[in-house]
Amino acid sequence: MSKMRVEVVSTEQLIFSGEAEFVVAPATEGEIGVYPQHVPLLTRIKPGVLRLKVPGTKEEVLVAVSGGMMEVQPSLITVLADTAIRGEDLDEARANEAKRAAEDALKHATDDMSTAKAHAALAVAIAELKTLDYLKKRAH
């Protein structure tokens, strides 16, 4: 099968650098699947699960992303994420607590700015929990 180079970078560090047979990303208009030789494009990504299919295996690398940009070239995909955490590095208890705190902040938000921050934090926590759910399903 054909493959492409994929680079996933957060503001803090390089998260993934390697080859993939395909990539599924949470674009703002819906999930987008990208195979090698895809037509070039630039898209915003929203909080969600980035899935990278590792060549020659059934393995997928899962990354929780909080948003950012994805550039697609025929043989290279670059994801510039605001924050990104590999699935195996996520902490379920911390993600659940972050979700609870964001929901609480949303209930007590008094202005547009605090409401927007709470919505953003909630979206990130949900993306992390969704990534953990993918990992659990894959283990079965």
UniProtKB/Swiss-Prot annotation:
The keyword Zinc does not apply. It is found in: Cell inner membrane. The keyword NAD does not apply. SUPFAM superfamilies: Epsilon subunit of F1F0-ATP synthase C-terminal domain, Epsilon subunit of F1F0-ATP synthase N-terminal domain. Keywords: ATP synthesis, Cell inner membrane, Cell membrane, CF(1), Hydrogen ion transport, Ion transport, Membrane, Transport. It is a peripheral membrane protein. GO terms for cellular component: plasma membrane; proton-transporting ATP synthase complex. GO terms for molecular function: ATP binding; proton-transporting ATP synthase activity, rotational mechanism. Pfam families: ATP-synt_DE, ATP-synt_DE_N. It comes from the Bacteria. F-type ATPases have 2 components, CF(1) - the catalytic core - and CF(0) - the membrane proton channel. CF(1) has five subunits: alpha(3), beta(3), gamma(1), delta(1), epsilon(1). CF(0) has three main subunits: a, b and c. PANTHER family: ATP SYNTHASE DELTA/EPSILON CHAIN, ATP SYNTHASE EPSILON CHAIN, CHLOROPLASTIC. Produces ATP from ADP in the presence of a proton gradient across the membrane. Belongs to the ATPase epsilon chain family. This is ATP synthase epsilon chain. It comes from Chromobacterium violaceum (strain ATCC 12472 / DSM 30191 / JCM 1249 / CCUG 213 / NBRC 12614 / NCIMB 9131 / NCTC 9757 / MK). The gene is atpC.
